[in-house]
A protein has these predicted regions:
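N-terminal pre-domain and mature-chain start segments
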Residues: 1-119, 123-151
Length: 151
């Protein structure tokens, strides 16, 4: 079953009704849905460089028109790095590593121990949008989520 661009936009915007969402999730994906999804995302950004692959909400692999390089870019237009590097190393990072910082998010007795877990929050340097969160042990290196096979 093929869905209209309007229905897919409702999905992207979080406005789709539950019945349609259930049907979408439980049936095979139609062939043109990903292309329509990219078109919708492209319409939501202010820059013209084509989106190659969305990495998450407000984070994309794009092809810069100026030099045709594939870059990881935020919705605000910040180019973090080439697509095959870890963009998190170029983001603004907040590390919650004290009990007081953990208690900003969790009730006191439910907060993780900062000796065993920290919370790393990655932000866009331009807009301040929260792009990702990880909760590793304090000594663990920055996690490189994945490198897509798109060459």
């Amino acid at each position: 079953m093929a869905y209209t661009k309007t229905k897919i936009k409702d999905l992207v915007d979080g406005k789709i009704d539950r019945d349609t969402l259930h049907t979408m999730l439980s049936t095979p994906k139609d062939k043109e849905r990903f292309q329509i999804y990219l078109e919708i995302l492209q319409e939501q950004v202010e820059w013209d460089d084509p989106i190659i692959l969305p990495l998450g909400p407000k984070l994309y692999i794009v092809q810069r028109k100026s030099d045709r390089k594939w870059m990881i870019r935020s919705q605000a237009g910040y180019d973090f790095c080439p697509w095959n590097e870890n963009w998190k190393l170029h983001a603004r990072i907040r590390v919650r590593d004290t009990a007081a910082q953990m208690e900003e998010l969790y009730p006191r007795l439910m907060a993780p121990s900062p000796d065993w877990q920290v919370i790393r929050e990655y932000f866009c340097p331009i807009s301040g949008d929260l792009l990702d969160v990880e909760a590793p042990t304090p000594w663990y290196p920055v996690i490189h989520d994945f490198e897509p096979d798109i060459d």
